[in-house]
């Protein structure tokens, strides 16, 4: 994407849109490839990142709240320069859940997993992006019996980003999760999209996508974007977010 970028050490006190998408499905091993998905498949108690550290991870939302950042959920379609959406793959359909906050977009394959969810939040007030990224993986690490597969703090298409994937227990199921947070920065305002992809063990990963409408080279980066993704496979139409598949990473 093209456009001017603000200094990455802070965000101006302008609007920030946050989108979060989640896909849930089962993790399955299919070969001795790297990264080692076999290590995250067991449902027996494991030593998580939380138990091996002296400090409990602080979720991103809690960190932002602690530094005075305020915000509210908004519809993904309300973003102007940046459009974030989840196309519906074959066999998937929109899913309604009364327990999910308004303005949340959610699709599912069947009545449970896998699912993909997209949420957008508008944030206000200056804050340190680099410091915020340190909290981008906390939600995943705090999941029950979470076992990390891999993680990264490399930029995503030139944007500050934090990614983590692994597995955790939920209601008697072992879920694979893939989580990425991205802060696209620029002039004028900030947008923070997040995606999460979950799938239950024993099922084949499916693909969903985030789309930027129009030529992504014409989209000006404004403020920051947080992208959170969990499990399976998500991608953007123009700026792709790849999720593991058996052919390349050991998942069926």
Swiss-Prot record:
Gene Ontology, cellular component aspect: plasma membrane
Bilayer topology: Lipid-anchor
Residues making up the signal peptide according to the UniProt record: 1-29
Sequence ranges of Basic residues compositional bias: 206-217
Gene3D superfamilies membership: Mog1/PsbP, alpha/beta/alpha sandwich (3.40.1000.10)
Top-rank taxon, per record: Bacteria
Lipidation (N-palmitoyl cysteine): 30
Protein location: Cell membrane
Major localization listed first in the record, in broad terms: membrane
Record-given protein name: Putative lipoprotein LpqT
């Amino acid at each position: 994407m093209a456009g001017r970028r603000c200094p990455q050490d802070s965000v101006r006190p302008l609007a920030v849109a946050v989108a979060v998408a989640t896909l849930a499905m089962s993790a399955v091993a299919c070969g001795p490839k790297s990264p080692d998905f076999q290590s995250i498949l067991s449902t027996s108690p494991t030593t998580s990142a939380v138990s091996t550290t002296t400090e409990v991870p602080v979720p991103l939302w809690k960190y932002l709240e602690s530094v005075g950042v305020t915000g509210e959920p908004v519809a993904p379609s309300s973003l102007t320069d940046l459009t974030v959406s989840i196309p519906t793959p074959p066999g998937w359909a929109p899913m309604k859940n009364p327990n999910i906050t308004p303005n949340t977009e959610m699709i599912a394959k069947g009545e449970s997993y896998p699912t993909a969810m997209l949420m957008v939040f508008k944030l206000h007030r200056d804050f340190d992006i680099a410091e915020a990224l340190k909290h981008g993986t906390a939600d995943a690490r705090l999941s029950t019996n979470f076992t990390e597969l891999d993680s990264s703090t490399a930029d995503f298409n030139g944007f500050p980003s934090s990614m983590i994937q692994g597995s955790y227990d939920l209601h008697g199921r072992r879920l694979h999760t893939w989580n990425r947070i991205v802060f696209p920065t620029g002039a004028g305002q900030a947008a923070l999209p997040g995606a999460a992809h979950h799938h239950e063990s024993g099922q084949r990963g499916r693909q969903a996508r985030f789309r930027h409408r129009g030529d992504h080279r014409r989209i000006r980066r404004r403020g920051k974007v947080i992208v959170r993704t969990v499990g399976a496979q998500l991608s953007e139409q123009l700026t792709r977010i790849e999720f593991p598949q058996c052919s390349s990473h050991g998942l069926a």
